[in-house]
């Protein structure tokens, strides 16, 4: 099972007055829930995106016309919704039939670092392939390129905002 036997991860070093330094350790538990798909934007997905994209990153506008046509995925840890993303057929690349866009991947801060984003991305890729899709594309900020590259995505030459944003693609077949 994912995460079984995962070593503890150091999360901080604290200097205690009059005492030796002590390491604080925590084990990052794997997600213990499920991923569900919706044909509309659920309120819990909206709330996660508001927190991650609007409050933390100040993206505006966050919600757009693609929310109405996308498949929305929610990841649950137990009964709590902790992550979301959406995907839809890419209408802007008719030269690449079977290309889908995976977008708005967001994991709540207290659930990050547990592989939930990776699981959600893999689930979206499986669903796209099952629907006949052959290419997954993500539009990302450059500080997240490595996340996608570690999962098989390649940066394209479609860069924006002086390279701060770009498209990454992955063949699904």
Predicted feature residues:
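Conserved acetyl-CoA-binding loop-helix of GNAT-fold acetyltransferases
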Residues: 113-126
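C-terminal "cap" of GNAT-fold acetyltransferases
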Residues: 141-142, 161-173
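Short amphipathic alpha-helix that is part of the acyltransferase structural core
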Residues: 23-80
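Conserved GNAT acetyl-CoA-binding A-motif
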Residues: 128-141
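Conserved acetyl-CoA-binding loop of GNAT-fold acetyltransferases
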Residues: 149-159
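A conserved beta-turn-beta hairpin within the catalytic core of GNAT-like acetyltransferases
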Residues: 90-102, 112, 162-165
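Conserved beta-strand in the GNAT
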Residues: 74, 80-90, 99-106
């Amino acid at each position: 099972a994912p995460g079984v036997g995962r070593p503890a991860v150091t999360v901080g070093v604290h200097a205690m007055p009059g005492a030796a330094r002590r390491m604080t350790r925590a084990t990052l538990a794997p997600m213990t829930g499920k991923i569900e798909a919706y044909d509309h934007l659920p309120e819990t997905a909206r709330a996660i995106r508001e927190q991650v994209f609007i409050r933390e990153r100040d993206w505006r506008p966050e919600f757009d016309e693609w929310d109405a046509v996308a498949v929305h995925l929610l990841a649950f840890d137990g009964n709590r919704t902790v992550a979301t993303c959406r995907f839809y057929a890419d209408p802007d690349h008719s030269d690449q039939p079977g290309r889908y866009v995976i977008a708005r991947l967001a994991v709540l801060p207290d659930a990050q670092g547990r592989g939930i984003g990776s699981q959600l991305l893999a689930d979206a890729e499986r669903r796209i392939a099952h629907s006949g899709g052959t290419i997954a594309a993500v539009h990302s900020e450059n500080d997240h390129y490595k996340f996608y590259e570690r999962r098989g995505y390649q940066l394209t030459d479609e860069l924006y905002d002086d390279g701060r944003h770009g498209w990454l693609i992955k063949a699904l077949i």
